[in-house]
């Protein structure tokens, strides 16, 4: 089933290993295009959900679809360990969302939880991630991590406040907007950093451990740190 590109029809849960395949639960359609999916698992509780995998091993990745018209695109050479993509929840489906993983990325331990419609997550090529917890609770929000970046242990990314904030005078929601978190090319995000609202980290920058980033920064080649984060030093770069 997983040796070549093809359409796999009518399953909600599929687990594959080198020696055997297990198919369970009710029957739904899903388009599953990949060459290397040993030890991968997919739960599909919707329709027209797609996975396009270009020669990356999905061992260590779980994908859960709760909703319709969602897609996962994984470029060549990316690997996963104990990582999960959640499109919605069992009683809270989401539609028209996308997760894109570029070439030669490494995602070790963590989850990306998309909790509302029309959200996008893009992780560009040669990015490494350790124990990421990303949640998209608001419609049309997005997370973009540019190429050659590194996220240390315990990073949290939430493009929203988590709950609606209401103005008591007119009962209108004051934080109802499209949040976009952006991490620039070749950035190093330290351990236990939190990025919220529409946080933006410029190219070639570092964010110090335990920092809270809640706004857009625009000076490249800089160090940002603190709660909330602020510019600490500029005219720097870093290497592994």
Where are these regions (language model features)?
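Terminal amphipathic alpha-helical/low-complexity segments used for targeting or macromolecular assembly
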Residues: 1-83, 148, 154-155, 162-166, ...
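Beta-strand elements of modular eukaryotic interaction domains
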Residues: 63, 89-90, 213
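Flexible, glycine/small-residue-enriched loop-and-beta-strand segment within the central core
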Residues: 71-200, 227-228, 235-236
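Generic hydrophobic alpha-helical segments
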Residues: 194, 212-214, 231
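C-terminal/domain-terminus segments
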Residues: 200-225
